[in-house]
Amino acid sequence: DLGLNKIVYSLADSLSDEEDISVYDKTEFFDKVFENNNARLGFHYTVSKDSFSRLEQVVNETVETFKSRCYFDRVSLLRFVPHGKGTTDMDLSKEELFTIKNLYLNSNDKDKIRLGTPWNILGIENTPCIIADEIMIIGFDGIAYPCDSIKYFTKLGISGNIRENSLMEMYNSEYFSNIRKFNIDNSCSACERYSICKSGCIGQKIIANYTESDNKVLTLKRCINSRDPKCMR
């Protein structure tokens, strides 16, 4: 037994001339790895301006190749988190977001495609956000971050460090506690889409709306209280 319940394989989100190895040629390898094991295999694909053109091909080929295998879970589409130059060069347009929505809605294998909370903005379904609650990301620096989307972002607080603090201490830290507290109600509550969207991705809102301030708590509250930068309304 592998001692694991799931293995996630990240699919290349861009192709270079040097990349000539395809995951689809390695099915026998995966069959051997998961033989007589209860673990599942999932795939991650980050959707950005660079990878958008290959999205439909990647999703269809991955699902078609692995859906008959009992160990296959789903292919998860990860929403690109824009930082720095990526804010203008790699972020998706509203038209591209609609294309992603239609790709999912028109698929006959929806059960094999995972969108997740950051895609609630598409208005398809609500996946409850578990930031700072059911999820804790430990970085290489030992710091516990509330979500992958704001990993290594420390301008609004730090929960603690695994080298010095217990998981419970970091979960109950002021930073994590404030995120959970502020993520209950916000300015989008009156919107007809709110029951599905829930104002979008908290990590995306923090990255997009953060401004330097001495009052980190109020800044955090303002960011969480804002609309998702890719609001589809």
Predicted segments — roles?
Residues 2-145, 149-165:
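Radical SAM enzyme [4Fe-4S]-AdoMet core and its adjacent flexible, acidic
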Residues 149-233:
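Flexible mid-to-C-terminal extensions adjoining Fe-S/redox cofactors in radical SAM and related proteins
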